[in-house]
């Protein structure tokens, strides 16, 4: 018999690992623009960038939609997953962000459906093909983590860990951060990640918001860069 606690922890590690093929490692969330324009060049600046992104955008929009998708899927209410998907799509103002969220969400759903056999994932696949859902990555992540048996908090932590490590990986590839510095930042972000969880867990979908104009402008300017390593 498989120990359920061990199974959950292994699923958490599997889903938060960059080895899991969703293409999220190709996203810089505006960091590439800010580096190329000289606005971010140091460890403290990257830390601040991540803190603002977590507290003023991801934590009060993406994570909220993730949690409601998780709860809906856990209760067998796929319509709740669809609602979370629609609400987050409206909340995501930048077209390129919507596109990349859909791409990684569809990739996640495809890989998860091939790895874990579950009727709820099959239904979401049908929805994706028929256009009933946008398939945004945070929403699909919430549904998948519910299916594989993670508890709600661990689902959020897995998502945030994956997001942060992908951005830190982008900073390393852009040449402005070393591996040891990245680990230091990851540790420094623990209070911010805890705060995101504490805030998002009690929010409803109508309360989602974001206020990161500096990052939003950088993301909108990204397509104009002469040379790009990342998709956004």
UniProtKB/Swiss-Prot annotation:
GO terms for molecular function: nickel cation binding. Keywords: Chaperone, Cytoplasm, Nickel insertion. It is found in: Cytoplasm. Its main location: cytoplasm. It holds the Pfam family UreF. The keyword Lipoprotein does not apply. InterPro entries: UreF, UreF_sf. Required for maturation of urease via the functional incorporation of the urease nickel metallocenter. Belongs to the UreF family. This is Urease accessory protein UreF.
């Amino acid at each position: 018999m498989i120990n359920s606690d061990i199974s959950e922890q292994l699923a958490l590690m599997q889903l938060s690992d960059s080895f899991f093929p969703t293409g999220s490692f190709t996203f810089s969330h505006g960091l590439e623009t800010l580096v190329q324009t000289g606005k971010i060049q140091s460890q403290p600046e990257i830390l601040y960038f991540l803190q603002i992104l977590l507290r003023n955008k991801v934590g009060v929009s993406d994570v909220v939609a993730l949690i409601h998708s998780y709860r809906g899927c856990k209760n067998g209410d796929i319509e709740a997953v669809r609602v979370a998907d629609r609400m987050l799509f409206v909340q995501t103002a930048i077209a390129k962000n919507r596109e990349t969220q859909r791409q990684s969400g569809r990739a996640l759903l495809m890989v998860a459906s091939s790895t874990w056999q579950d009727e709820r994932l099959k239904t979401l696949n049908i929805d994706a093909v028929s256009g009933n859902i946008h398939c945004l990555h945070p929403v699909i992540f919430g549904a998948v983590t519910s299916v594989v048996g993670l508890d709600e908090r661990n689902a959020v932590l897995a998502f945030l860990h994956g997001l942060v490590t992908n951005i830190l990986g982008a900073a390393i590839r852009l040449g402005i951060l070393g591996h040891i510095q990245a680990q230091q930042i990851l540790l420094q972000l623990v209070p911010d990640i805890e705060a995101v969880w504490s805030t998002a867990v009690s929010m409803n979908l109508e309360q989602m918001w974001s206020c990161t104009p500096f990052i939003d402008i950088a993301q909108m300017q990204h397509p104009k860069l002469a040379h790009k390593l990342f998709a956004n």
